[in-house]
């Protein structure tokens, strides 16, 4: 995971540009390929005596969204779907826990929960697509 190693907005933008180049390379190999980028989950680190979301996380997500949109790819925001800032802390406190006490990884139940959220969004978007397709 790159989040702990990205320390500035400039590095986040550079990471997003690198990611964009990787998508473009794959599209060059297969121009018909479609991509769905899944953004990173919330993750936290200790600051003084409390756990907080990595401060650079939102910048990295923004850079990845830009890379996705600039390459006509789709983007699913896992961070936002979890609940945003400090949500990993809430997920770890649930019973049963949805996130490990490292505040980075999901438990098996948490992985199923995030998968369910993703599938729900995907199916809703597909339903909207079919409705709009039939109207046109």
Model region roles, listed by residue range:
Residues 10-18, 52-59:
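Alpha-helix N-cap and loop-to-helix initiation/capping positions
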Residues 42-136:
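Catalytic His-Asp segment of secreted/periplasmic serine-dependent ester chemistry enzymes
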Residues 13-20, 24, 112, 116, ...:
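Amphipathic, non-transmembrane alpha-helical secondary structure
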Residues 1-14, 42-43:
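Oxyanion-hole/transition-state-stabilizing segment in secreted/luminal serine hydrolases
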Residues 19-23, 27, 34-39, 43, ...:
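Conserved, well-ordered alpha-helix/loop/beta-strand core segments that scaffold catalytic motifs
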Residues 29-31, 69:
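Short, structurally constrained coil/turn elements
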Residues 1, 31-32:
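Proline-aspartate-enriched helix->loop->beta-strand connector
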């Amino acid at each position: 995971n790159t989040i702990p190693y990205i320390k500035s907005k400039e590095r986040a933008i550079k990471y997003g540009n690198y990611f964009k180049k990787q998508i473009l390379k794959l599209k060059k190999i297969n121009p018909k390929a479609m991509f769905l980028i899944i953004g990173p989950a919330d993750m936290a680190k200790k600051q003084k005596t409390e756990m907080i979301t990595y401060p650079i996380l939102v910048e990295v997500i923004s850079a990845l969204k830009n890379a996705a949109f600039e390459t006509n790819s789709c983007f699913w925001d896992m961070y936002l779907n979890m609940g945003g800032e400090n949500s990993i802390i809430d997920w770890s406190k649930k019973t049963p826990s949805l996130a490990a006490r490292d505040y980075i990884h999901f438990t098996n139940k948490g992985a199923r929960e995030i998968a369910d959220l993703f599938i729900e969004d995907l199916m809703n978007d597909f339903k909207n697509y079919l409705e709009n397709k039939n109207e046109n």
